Amino acid sequence: MDEYSFRIANRIVGNHKKAPGIEITLSGPKLLFHHDVVVAITGGKAEVDVNGNPVDQWAPIFIKAGDKLSIGKLSTGCRAYLAIRGGIDVTEYLGSRSTFALGNLGGYNGRVLKLGDVLFLGQPELPSCTLPSAVSEPTKIPESLIPSYDFNANKSWKVGVTCGPHGSPDFFKPESVDEFFSAKWKIHYNSNRFGVRLIGPKPQWARKDGGEAGLHPSNAHDYVYSLGAINFTGDEPVILTCDGPSLGGFVCEAVVAEAEMWKIGQVKPGDTIQFVPLSFEDAKSLKSKQDSLVESLQGELPSIETKALPKPENPVLGEVQVSPNAPKVVYRQAGDRYILVEYGENVLDLNLSYRIHKLIEMVKDNKTKGIVEMSQGVRSVLVEFDSEVTQKQLLQTLISYEKEIVFENKWKVPSRVIKLPMAFEDEKTLAAVKRYSETIRAEAPWLPNNVDFIASINGVDRSDVKNMMYTARFLVLGLGDVFLGAPCAVPLDPRHRLLGTKYNPSRTYTPNGTVGIGGNYMCIYTMESPGGYQLVGRTVPIWDKLSLGSHSVNPWLLSPFDQVEFYPASEAEVDECSERMNAGKFKVEIVDSVFDHGAYLKWVQEHSASIEEFQKNQGGEKLEEFNRLIQISNAELATNGGVKLGEDEKFSDDAELVYSEYSGRFWKPLVAVGDEVKQGQGLIVVEAMKTEMVVNATRGGKVVKIFHDNGDMVDAGDLVVVIE
């Protein structure tokens, strides 16, 4: 999350830049070493000692076998980093040694570290070791390289961003963009490696809805997100970070500059952020200077204060106008290392998917310099590039390729028909909806039942929604929605495209294998994760983590242009099939085929009368009514913190008022009113950033009052317990 601090930690101990280390959130571990090693601890300030003797951060620490290293609570910042000379020897998975805890992948058994875990260090002399050797001797660094982490609600972090990919006047009103940069955004307690949620002014939208993509103006046809994108999930902004989603259907107003992402890794609940608009050139310059600092260990961190643009930039870098043989193409700035290439108007058109397919093929065939990766969305492709090419050069190259693509209407691509079992509205699916209503938002148009909402807004019966799920064939247009190869797929029959909207705010939990509908699209969730689609049922896992299945050349099951069908199954059958799938024993029914767009257009034409009738009847007054409800019912329902003592609440003169040190959700009390407690004893648990933190008694006595109920919001400084 704070790449700068992690890189400096590796430099201090002399490690290769790819050596794995440990990221520590809010409170650190105690470690017993069995070998002589050199370590370094960077990031936020914490109490650090070896065998009870204090040691310095941001400097080499020489450890002997048998020594115990203790890292306490962070007093500034949110994260600290521990680098050990030689690195930590964990297996590489999909090109990384990082832990993706949400997906139970990578790192140490795919999870956070626990009491009793044994970590093995890199030993390059052993043939089995795949870690790179240390590259330099341990060294001290000048204080000028150590950032300040002393920020809070009254002293805002200044974070540099580039504008776009979505801006004004097409998505946000101009005054809303101005407010975005002038506002001080508070960090929400529910922030983590997935994303940093922000609390601030509601955006002023320049459009009433997302068209075919959904009923909320934040909805977009699914596209691939940039790392660091500030993503509006409904009216709620989230900064997408290391473990964030790959592809989704919400607009992004700005992207945090790559050199500024370390700050996002250090903000904690209750802190405030003010965004600073930067030019693309200044954002790249900041990254270049930061890399130079890490390599040379000389100089000081550059300031962004003098680099602020007088007004936000237009994120549109260029356009190719529509012609008889080609759609309109818009090239949008999507950070300082991405360009989002967007095709056509805001409608679903399979020709656009084929055009994206041809562009990706051209880049591969020409081995285009500087392009790192191309990631396909519904009507767009995200192009990641490196320092081998400038933004301007890449833009010119992409435009020149576009002119070479020949328009075709009768195209064919290889396709597989994949048939999966699905239990409609199983208990786990319904429990996820109920959990949302109990913990995030009690009332919304899609509550208490998502299927009822879909049926009502489309003027059909709930049985029609069920029949659609079992008779439709869904064409995969993008992957990674939200994670791990989850498909964004569209029903091929236009009569199966049901209007809807996504959750606002999004869910924090969706079961693995859940099937959702959002706007025109279907998604299968490939892990327990946040999400926004309306939930209708559950199928088998389609991410094969261990690649045990005969179908699994790669962990992901689906590819663009695959076609997915569901067949009815009971909840017990889906559970059994899921167990067999995870063990590599479930045989997925796969038929190799070809998607013939010419034949598809002919079929659509043959059924045009019934398709037009369906589209005419879809929505109407019901759609207008639901649109109205969504417009007036978009505020997240949450309990305010900041308990005030009422006039009738009198305590003795020697009463001890205990305040929370943390911002988060009141998780549970550890004591009850009337209990006798000792100084230092745990009183309550506050949950934030996937971490449980205990507020301890500041003195001994009797508990006479506990403020808040389970699930309430608590801010740092809020009164939580009274002891007499």
Q: What is each residue range found by the language model?
A:
Residues 1-648, 716:
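Conserved "landmark" site that anchors the functional core of diverse proteins
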Residues 55, 63, 113, 267, ...:
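Hydrophobic beta-strand core residues of beta-sandwich domains
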Residues 67, 379, 662, 673, ...:
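A generic "binding-loop/recognition-motif" signal
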Residues 119-120, 270, 675-696, 715-724:
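Short hydrophobic beta/alpha edge segments that flank linear recognition/processing sites
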Residues 164, 199-201, 520, 661-663, ...:
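A structural micro-motif recognizing beta-strand termini
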Residues 260, 265, 551, 667-676, ...:
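Short histidine-centered loop motifs in beta-beta connectors
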Residues 641-684, 694, 700:
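Acidic, low-complexity mobile loops and tails
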